[in-house]
Amino acid sequence: MNQMLAFIRLLRLPNLVIVFLTQFVPYWFALRPAILRANGIPVLSGRTFGLIAAATVLTTLAGYVLNDYYDRDIDAINRPDRRMWGRYLPAPMALTVYSGLVIVVHGLAFLIDRELRPSNHWPLWVYPAVSFLLFLYAWQLKCTAVVGNFLVSALCGVVPILLLLPEERPIWLTSFIQPDEVHRAVALVWLYGIFAFLTNLLREQVKDLEDFPGDAACGCMTLAVLKGPRFAKKPAGFTALTVSIMIGTLLIFWQQTGAPDWQIIAGAFLLLLPSLFATVAIYRAQVKKDFSRASVLIKIIMFTGVFLLLRSWPDNPMDVVTSFKAFIAAL
């Protein structure tokens, strides 16, 4: 693997796509249409949304780079063929890349704040705060029993909810005109946040079990290292069961509220079944390969959930194209 391929792999493009879609789908298919239907005027233009999405994605990427840098000794044991820093790319370069990304993100935060004036200047404190917390996670908290997992999962849950900040006033004004529709859209954004939190928490718990050998060898005090994998499987299995119950409840709600049949069927096969299989796989897992299978199922849930959670998804597929065109036109 040459340096260029190593750098591309370092980007974790599938994960970054999920981060982008977690903001794009609920905003452009739920929150923004609800505001417009209530004769409101959304604050975010396509350009401003693009800046927010770019800042969010680059903040995530900066976290990945720093996390891989601090994990290079652990990765040398757990996944030696996938270790980038110190093997395919010089380790000091990681700090340079990370610093460059953080500078770009902070520059984007100033641009966003300028676009949104007058505002409460939330971009000027949200992005620096998230960058600091991700640094703290990679540097220290990742190797803690519980705190690290909850912190990074909470930050993932904030990704879709972040877009409620600039639209706070339009949401408040339109809630007097069409309260039910606007409140449903806001609730859907929160649902995305809760789903992102739970699925990422599950992914982090399973990853700790999967990475147990390297974590133990390098003194990383995760729950699996402190209490043993057999004990650590219990909270991971409980989280998986919670996700399964949440998805099952949503399927019942969709059925009772007239959701399209294809959405219910797709939700059953692409969300509920993988979550149930993941729950069973975690409780039965004995070796690393078993946890890796559960991790794949969780990624399927995370990706398909971005689309299937959207209760107001258009019945006509061409409406999706129309929404994308509206986004491009608003840039």
Where are these regions (language model features)?
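C-terminal membrane-associated helical module and adjoining short loops/tails
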Residues: 1-18, 114, 139, 157-160, ...
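Intramembrane alpha-helical segments
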Residues: 5-9, 82-176
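Membrane-embedded alpha-helical segments that form the functional core of polytopic membrane enzymes
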Residues: 20-70, 105-106, 121-135, 180-205
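Alpha-helical membrane-inserting segments
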Residues: 25, 29, 33, 66, ...
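Multi-pass membrane catalytic core of lipid/isoprenoid biosynthesis enzymes
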Residues: 53-54, 72-127, 219-257
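C-terminal ends of transmembrane helices
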Residues: 68, 73, 132-147, 208, ...
